[in-house]
Amino acid sequence: MHTKDIKKIVLAYSGGLDTSAIIPWLKEHYGNCEVVAFVADVGQSREDLEGVEQKALRSGASECHVVDLREEFIKDYVYPVLKTGALYEGSYLLGTSMARPIIAKAQVELALKVGADALAHGATGKGNDQVRFESTYTALAPQLKVVAPWREWDLRSREALLDYLKARDIPTTATLEKIYSRDENAWHISTEGGVLESTWNASNKDCWVWTVDPEEAPDEAELVSVMIEKGEVVGVNGKVMSPYQCLEALNILGVKHGIGRIDIVENRLVGMKSRGCYETPGGTIMMAALRGVEQLVLDRDSFKWRQQLGLEMSYVVYDGRWFAPLRRSIQAAAETLAADVSGEVVLKLYKGQVTAIQKRSTNSLYSEAFATFGEDEVYDHSHAAGFIRLYSLPSRIRALNSKE
């Protein structure tokens, strides 16, 4: 890439150490180009956003745009994935993975608006995020150039980044003592690095940011009612709210009771394994509530296919293919399956556990008359004999043939 060809870059900016260093680095290495900082508000800590515009300008940005994406993030990105029941490798609720496409999409929109000719991000060359950002850029604005400083510069350590900023009199709150890498949005917070880099080290209290240690959570369980309409959470404890408000309400309860902690080793798209501690309190409660209604409403084959959709969706989202046709197809199928998934679930929150203890739906296929262990007048037990004979016919034929 010819650096002189780039006049204006829109950078996905967080205000952290890496992106604070990227602003002056871009100006130094790309012909003193103009750098516009873009900050996506996806529900991260308000402290992270406080003063972020001034910080970007002090680092050398010509402008800083903070865009509120919270409601859109939950409604148009989290809910479609939740509807499929997607869990990457069986446990990860895809908090970071779902946030990247909406951030990159809004970044592209700003770049087109301000007349930029390039996009930049602070993802490292080891991680998945570089793929997620750049796949979105390519899908939405292939004409824009892409700059990935971590794949170009020689600043390979936290100490080097701090020295780089100090030499240019750019203030930062980062220190060498902040050894963990974290990503936060309304759905979750992840912690990587530090003691977690050895899988033989147990996580410690510094690895958990939001949630109360389940052992220190209240000794008394708390009940919460969640309302579902067509596979989406629409209310909490009888109050109808927006998707983001529902998540906020459930996050508060989940944090209090230590809900939604996982400590996992996952397979990254780029080939290596990584370890992280993830906290998804409200999302874990939402998933349990949705599963409760699905158990009532979906027949056996429908539920099996919903599971298949969730498995495939988990890889599509994790791998950064949000804007691929396959994601849209999976989402369309999930919405069809969720058309009757409406109802109410009461869940018990207690020391890290969430349990659905009551559930109801006007579309329920559960029939107490058929399911009872007591005497009933609707189910003829003798009918089972013919069903079993036909169901097991292949096994019968195989056994008979083996004796010949």
UniProtKB/Swiss-Prot annotation:
One of its GO terms (molecular function) is argininosuccinate synthase activity. Pathway: Amino-acid biosynthesis; L-arginine biosynthesis; L-arginine from L-ornithine and carbamoyl phosphate: step 2/3. Transmembrane segments: none annotated. It is found in: Cytoplasm. Keywords: Amino-acid biosynthesis, Arginine biosynthesis, ATP-binding, Cytoplasm, Ligase, Nucleotide-binding. SUPFAM superfamilies: Adenine nucleotide alpha hydrolases-like, Argininosuccinate synthetase, C-terminal domain. L-aspartate binds at residues 124, 128-129. Belongs to the argininosuccinate synthase family. Type 1 subfamily. Homotetramer. This is Argininosuccinate synthase. It comes from Photorhabdus laumondii subsp. laumondii (strain DSM 15139 / CIP 105565 / TT01).
